């Protein structure tokens, strides 16, 4: 999992507003979500990974073990049950579930880019992060 470790800055995003809309995120929060460029930092302590997301809007930290469900509060305020699986050394999949939706977030390292694909039902967004 060393390919994920370190800091990543959002460099480009496609269709994120549509995903937020599908999740029922309010218009003002969607506007903020469309303008911020978060930095994501991954660290490992044994078999536990922490993902810290920092932006001018909000800072969030989630700590998890692969394959174990945990409670998570999303940046838009939803409470979800989440699980992260390790697909390979360079690819992880996070599944978030609440009463209404299932969100699948695939993060894959390709060179110095972390390609993040966010899917809710039939709506998909791509968010690319560059290694800092």
UniProtKB/Swiss-Prot annotation:
InterPro entries in the cross-refs: Calycin (IPR012674), Fatty_acid-bd (IPR000463), ILBP (IPR031259), Lipocln_cytosolic_FA-bd_dom (IPR000566)
Residues annotated as binding (5Z,8Z,11Z,14Z)-eicosatetraenoate: 107, 127-129
Name of protein: Fatty acid-binding protein
Any one GO molecular-function label of the UniProt entry: lipid binding
Upper taxonomic lineage: Eukaryota, Metazoa, Spiralia, Lophotrochozoa, Platyhelminthes
Pfam family, one: Lipocalin
UniProt entry keywords in alphabetical sequence: Cytoplasm, Lipid-binding, Transport
PROSITE patterns, A to Z: FABP (PS00214)
Family note: Belongs to the calycin superfamily. Fatty-acid binding protein (FABP) family.
Transmembrane segment boundaries: none
Domain notes: Forms a beta-barrel structure that accommodates hydrophobic ligands in its interior.
Stated role: May play a role in the transport of fatty acids. Binds to various fatty acids but not retinoids.
Organism, as annotated: Schistosoma japonicum
Consequence of substituting residue 79 to S: In variants D, E and F
GO cellular component, one term: cytoplasm
SUPFAM superfamilies: Lipocalins
Positions that bind (9Z)-octadecenoate: 107, 127-129
Localization terms from the record: Cytoplasm
Effect of residue 89 to D: In variants D and E
Signal peptide: none
């Amino acid at each position: 999992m060393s390919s994920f470790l370190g800091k990543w800055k959002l460099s480009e995003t496609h269709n994120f507003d549509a995903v937020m809309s599908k999740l029922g995120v309010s218009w003002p929060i969607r506007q903020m979500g469309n303008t911020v460029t978060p930095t994501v930092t991954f660290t490992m302590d044994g078999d536990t990974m922490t993902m810290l997301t920092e932006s001018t809007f909000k800072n969030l930290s989630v700590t998890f073990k692969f394959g174990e469900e945990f409670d998570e509060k999303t940046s838009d305020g939803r409470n979800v049950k989440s699980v992260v699986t390790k697909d390979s050394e360079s690819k992880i999949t996070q599944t978030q579930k609440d009463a209404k939706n299932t969100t699948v977030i695939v993060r894959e390292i390709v060179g110095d880019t972390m390609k993040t694909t966010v899917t809710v039902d039939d709506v998909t967004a791509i968010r690319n992060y560059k290694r800092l």
